[in-house]
Curated annotation (Swiss-Prot):
The keyword Isomerase appears for this protein: yes
Designated gene of the protein: fabA
EC number: 4.2.1.59, 5.3.3.14
Keywords: Cytoplasm, Fatty acid biosynthesis, Fatty acid metabolism, Isomerase, Lipid biosynthesis, Lipid metabolism, Lyase
Species assigned in the record: Pseudomonas syringae pv. syringae (strain B728a)
Source species, domain of life: Bacteria
Protein name: 3-hydroxydecanoyl-[acyl-carrier-protein] dehydratase
Listed pathway(s): Lipid metabolism; fatty acid biosynthesis
Family matches, as NCBIfam families: fabA, PRK05174.1
Length: 171
């Protein structure tokens, strides 16, 4: 079976309902926490480390929910949502590779914010570079990522860690 290398918004919504990788396996969050509109490229080769990469996008418009509350009179997308989007994509990668279980963000190394997403922006682009995938009792991916707005890099994160668990009872 050939792997799909791009995913539409509808595909991602299917993933949020648990329909893309099967019951009990990796899911994306549902809207409003789903911070990705499409994955334009996913591969288990390439990227900075030669172990895989993802490129995904989020369309920005002034009506997005977070602009109304963060901050009143000074709307900006919370940086933590961009960080969460990168974790979402690393978890998606594990599911796409066929690793069973539910995804959980496990941490990251250094995170830097040096720009912002305003309601006047058009598009956020996420770039994820897989560093390592560990398979065993716990299937874990480690990646570096960046967030760009309208072509300008504004956040970076090193050592993004996501695991998939067949049971989250004792997590």
């Amino acid at each position: 079976m050939t792997k799909q290398h791009a995913f539409t918004r509808e595909d991602l919504l299917r993933c949020s309902r648990g329909e893309l990788f099967g019951p009990g396996n990796a899911q994306l969050p549902a809207p409003n926490m789903l911070m990705v509109d499409r994955i334009t490229h996913i591969s288990d080769e390439g990227g900075k480390f030669g172990k895989g990469e993802l490129v995904a996008e989020l369309d920005i418009n002034p009506d997005l929910w977070f602009f109304a509350c963060h901050f009143e009179g000074d709307p900006v997308m919370p940086g933590c949502l961009g960080l969460d989007a990168m974790w979402q994509l690393v978890g998606f990668y594990l599911g796409w590779q066929g690793n069973p279980g539910r995804g959980r963000a496990l941490g990251s190394g250094e995170v830097k914010f040096f720009g912002q997403v305003l309601p006047t922006a058009k598009k956020v682009t996420y770039n994820i570079h897989i560093k390592r995938v560990l398979k065993g009792k716990l299937n874990l991916a480690i990646a570096d990522g960046s967030v760009s707005v309208d072509g300008r890099e504004i956040y970076t994160a090193e050592g993004l860690r996501v695991g998939v668990f067949t049971s989250t009872e004792n997590f």
